[in-house]
């Protein structure tokens, strides 16, 4: 893995506008950063990214299978008891999932380490699957990278294939909250993939969902919603006043209820418990448990429910705060994880996001930040394969 500078396309703003990339600049700061690119060899991708992703995902599914049979685990995950049985039912029925993203730290001279699994509402999808590929095609044409360069990116192909597998004559609804540009773009992109698969689709904001007779969900025209993709956290749905309606399983949600076990930072201590010493895992433990690291080693504290680095704190071996990100999750239960520093290139720390669609590893995106904690504003940098 090498990073090098590349020229920015002179008409980048127009290209972004033409392709609906409305958030390539966030708060007057660069989000999509194509002034640099990462180069990987095919062997690095296959052995260090794709293969571990596939193995870790299967391990995660084993955790789900154990968790739905163990009330102690569900308690540690802070999942409300009201939903334990319906989550287990969702798993037994193999309610279909769509996608997820594993976040890795990789320094190049040791196996990748899994930091967390964003299995419910992962973003940076559009830029990983689509806009990054546009960059590759332009970069090859202009000669700034080898003309035979490739990219680890079959994300869009797999998404369309997955929507084909999920095809139904009933419309597929796509939902997110209002006033969230990145979420809206992600949902529109997924909706487009569904349409390419021949699936009728409709968009509705979460705030516009209605309740019909008997507690069915309806759209603004009072049509009953039977299937919906929601870029809205499962734990928020469970905590909502109407959350108990999830128990009736009238709608098919994507992501399904069993994903609440994987979209939880408590997954990390469970993986370490069931697969101790695995080369791609970091020692992790729940608050109140015996630390799984030696005295004097650095560690990270994370809320069980947290997104985009919110309320994550890094401590050194003397319990001094090294870095901290503010957020809205300070009151959530906490887990602890051995600290794995991100590789540093110049003034930036690099995080690899490895994508999974329907249980298959299929691509990646790279984020950079000037701090050790990756956030929603962290820059996205394209990659390519050569050699």
Curated annotation (Swiss-Prot):
SUPFAM superfamilies: Glutathione synthetase ATP-binding domain-like (SSF56059), PreATP-grasp domain (SSF52440). Disruption phenotype: Deletion of this gene does not affect the ability to synthesize glutathionylspermidine. There is no visible differences between wild-type and mutant strain growth in LB media. Keywords: ATP-binding, Ligase, Magnesium, Metal-binding, Nucleotide-binding. GO terms for molecular function: ATP binding; ligase activity; metal ion binding. Pfam families: GSP_synth (PF03738). The record marks 101 as: Transition state stabilizer. Mg(2+) 1 binds at residues 103, 116. ATP binds at residues 101-103, 265, 302, 309, 337, 372-374. InterPro entries: GSPS_pre-ATP-grasp-like_dom (IPR005494), PreATP-grasp_dom_sf (IPR016185). Mg(2+) 2 binds at residues 116, 118. Belongs to the glutathionylspermidine synthase preATP-grasp family. This is Putative acid--amine ligase YjfC.
């Amino acid at each position: 893995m090498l990073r090098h500078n590349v020229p920015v396309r002179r008409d980048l703003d127009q290209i972004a506008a033409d392709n609906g990339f409305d958030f390539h600049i966030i708060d007057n700061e660069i989000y999509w950063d194509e002034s640099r690119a990462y180069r990987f060899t095919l062997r690095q991708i296959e052995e260090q990214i794709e293969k571990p992703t596939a193995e870790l995902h299967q391990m995660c599914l084993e955790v789900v299978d154990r968790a739905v049979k163990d009330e102690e685990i569900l308690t540690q995950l802070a999942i409300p008891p009201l939903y334990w049985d319906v989550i287990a039912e969702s798993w037994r029925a193999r309610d279909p999932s769509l996608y997820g993203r594993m976040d890795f730290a990789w320094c190049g001279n040791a196996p990748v380490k899994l930091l967390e699994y964003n299995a419910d509402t992962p973003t940076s999808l559009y830029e990983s699957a689509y806009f990054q590929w546009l960059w590759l095609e332009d970069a090859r044409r202009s000669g700034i990278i080898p003309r035979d360069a490739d990219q680890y990116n079959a994300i869009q192909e797999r998404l369309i294939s997955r929507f084909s597998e999920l095809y139904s004559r009933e419309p597929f609804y796509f939902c997110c909250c209002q006033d969230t540009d990145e979420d809206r773009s992600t949902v529109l992109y997924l909706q487009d993939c569904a349409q390419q698969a021949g699936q009728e689709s409709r968009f509705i904001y979460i705030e516009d969902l209605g309740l019909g007779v008997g507690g069915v969900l309806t759209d603004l025209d009072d049509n009953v919603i039977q299937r919906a993709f929601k870029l809205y956290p499962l734990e928020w749905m469970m905590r909502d006043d109407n959350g108990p309606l999830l128990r009736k399983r009238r709608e098919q949600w994507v992501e399904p209820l069993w994903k609440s076990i994987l979209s939880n930072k408590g997954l990390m201590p469970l993986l370490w418990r069931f697969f101790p010493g695995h080369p791609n895992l970091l020692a992790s433990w729940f608050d109140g448990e015996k630390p799984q690291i030696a005295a004097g080693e650095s560690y990270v504290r994370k809320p069980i429910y947290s997104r985009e680095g919110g309320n994550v704190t890094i401590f050194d071996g003397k319990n001094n705060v090294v870095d901290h990100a503010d957020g809205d999750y300070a009151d959530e239960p906490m887990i602890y994880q051995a600290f794995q520093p991100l590789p540093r290139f110049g003034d930036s720390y690099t995080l690899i996001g490895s994508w999974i669609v329907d249980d298959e590893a299929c691509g990646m995106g790279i984020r950079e930040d000037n701090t050790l904690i990756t956030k929603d504003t962290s820059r996205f940098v394209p990659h390519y394969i050569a050699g």
